[in-house]
A protein has these predicted regions:
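Key DNA-contact positions within bacterial/archaeal DNA-binding proteins
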Residues: 32-34
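An amphipathic alpha-helix adjacent to DNA-recognition modules
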Residues: 1-9, 13, 18-19, 30, ...
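Amphipathic C-terminal alpha-helical segment
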Residues: 132-149, 163-173
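Amphipathic alpha-helical segments used for helix-helix packing
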Residues: 82-108, 139-146
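Amphipathic alpha-helical packing segments from all-alpha helical-bundle domains
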Residues: 96-131, 150-164
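Actinobacteria-biased recognition of intrinsically disordered, low-complexity terminal regions
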Residues: 168-196
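Append "Primarily bacterial transcriptional regulators
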Residues: 23-27, 36
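Hydrophobic alpha-helical connector segments
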Residues: 49, 63-90, 110-115, 130
Length: 196
């Protein structure tokens, strides 16, 4: 399954969602297309496996960034988020813009991957606003929608500073963000994914 997911990711990044077909994937790994169905029930299952893989990798990167961030929580989180989106733009688009059946995701995966936004802000609505800033800025950057000459690095930093200030203003007697949190994926998502 690891080889299939790796090849699928390469196809996705090379040709976008439209370029990801079972036939192309089979050709890429050197098997006949019907043999893929022993591992995945079809393209929707393949896309779901890619979304799960992407959420797991993003979650690990974000949890690590928050654990190492100290008082620069939002900045480190946004740096990690931007790095993941920039390194894997088509996977990022599939995760955030593609439609997939949420009910079929590994239980708890999406919430765990998004938890670092809450760990940084300490408040659910502020966490959602931080994610909205991160996602909106990432998509605008990927689509090259900022005005020519815009200092996008400065835009990311300004967002981080604003959210750090808002988090400090709203944080009462709560402990530091990330206190007691692990950085690895939950045990239920660490193993090899089985057939779908």
């Amino acid at each position: 399954m690891t080889e299939i997911i790796g090849a699928a990711r390469a196809l996705l990044e090379a040709g976008g969602r439209e370029g990801l077909t079972m036939r192309r994937l089979a050709d890429e790994i050197g098997i006949r297309a019907p043999s893929l169905y022993k591992h995945l029930s079809g393209r929707p299952a393949l896309e779901l496996a890619l979304v799960e893989t992407g959420l797991e990798e993003t979650g690990v990167a974000l949890h690590r960034a928050v654990a190492a961030s100290g008082s620069a929580g939002a900045g480190c989180l946004l740096d990690a988020y931007r790095a993941m989106g920039s390194a894997h733009p088509e996977l990022y688009r599939l995760i955030t813009a593609g439609s997939f059946p949420r009910s079929e995701l590994l239980p708890g995966l999406e919430a765990w991957a998004g938890e670092p936004f809450y760990l940084v802000t300490g408040e659910p609505h502020l966490a959602q606003a931080l994610w909205a800033f991160a996602h909106g800025t990432m998509i605008l950057e990927l689509e090259r929608r900022f005005l020519e000459g815009s200092d996008i690095d400065l835009t990311w930093r300004a967002g981080a500073e604003a959210f750090n200030a808002a988090s400090r203003a709203g944080r009462c007697a709560a402990g530091p963000a990330g206190e007691g949190q692990g950085v690895g994926a939950p045990a239920l998502i660490r193993g090899e994914m089985g057939p779908r």
